[in-house]
Amino acid sequence: MEKFKAVLDLQRKHRNALGYSLVTLLTAGGEKIFSSVVFQCPCTATWNLPYGLVFLLVPALALFLLGYALSARTWRLLTGCCSRSARFSSGLRSAFVCAQLSMTAAFAPLTWVAVALLEGSFYQCAVSGSARLAPYLCKGRDPNCNATLPQAPCNKQKVEMQEILSQLKAQSQVFGWILIAAVIILLLLVKSVTRCFSPVSYLQLKFWEIYWEKEKQILQNQAAENATQLAEENVRCFFECSKPKECNTPSSKDWQEISALYTFNPKNQFYSMLHKYVSREEMSGSVRSVEGDAVIPALGFVDDMSMTNTHEL
């Protein structure tokens, strides 16, 4: 049991690194399956370029959209935004949150493109069908090279085609490593700038993360317990044809208040929207944004809180 707790603690401490590692492994594995099982270059001047680009970019686009769909912040931002009764966040704040979501969602597609470029098959197929690059690839080669170039991915036995494919694979791998280096540098820069502009110290940020984990866990347990009690009372009253007991549950407005995007204010340092809500008496009964509220990138994890719809009873 102690070992299991140690594993859980390790997972909590390094959840971001473990998450990115898992995404990288799954993306690399998916690309390997696509390139070896599904991908078959048509080897025609008409289809090589679009076929190669589709396999290189469309899965990346799908992973990008999936990254949005799997983010709790996305649904926190979108849920109820078209309702007349919903309170709209400022356009600048929403745009800033969308930019953060885009950067997070872009990790998997960039991984796909980088792995695909290192493997080289998609790039070889696409470039061999490009009429603009044909003169460059066929420079100093057989006069019929331009016409036979689209067939290069299917004629790997020919020496001339092997040379062209080797050249294309080398180019693809160079671009792949450049992309990987650029992504790593960008991640380090963003992380450094985010921490540099953090309004709280390193230790307070760690305390904040501990609080966030505990609040998320307790909210999940308490919500499941209250939902179970309410369901049991309603079912009991249905079968007994009796009136239900009074059950105090948060109103729709209450849920909207704690579901809003978190904003930081140095005058009132609340650790979550739930914390801000229960302290609302100090703020004239409202948790709406006030002057000084700001979206802080280093505190973006606060908006990742969500409740699952399954619970062991």
Swiss-Prot record:
Modification after translation, per record: N-glycosylated.
Location in or out of the cell: Cell membrane
Keywords from the UniProt entry: Cell membrane, Disulfide bond, Immunity, Inflammatory response, Innate immunity, Ion channel, Ion transport, Membrane, Transmembrane, Transmembrane helix, Transport
Any coiled-coil regions, as ranges: none
Induction: Up-regulated in macrophages and dendritic cells upon stimulation with type I IFN, Poly(I:C) and LPS. Down-regulated by anti-inflammatory stimuli.
Cytoplasmic side: 1-21, 69-101, 191-313
Family the entry assigns: Belongs to the CALHM family.
Protein's recorded name: Calcium homeostasis modulator protein 6
Organism: Mus musculus
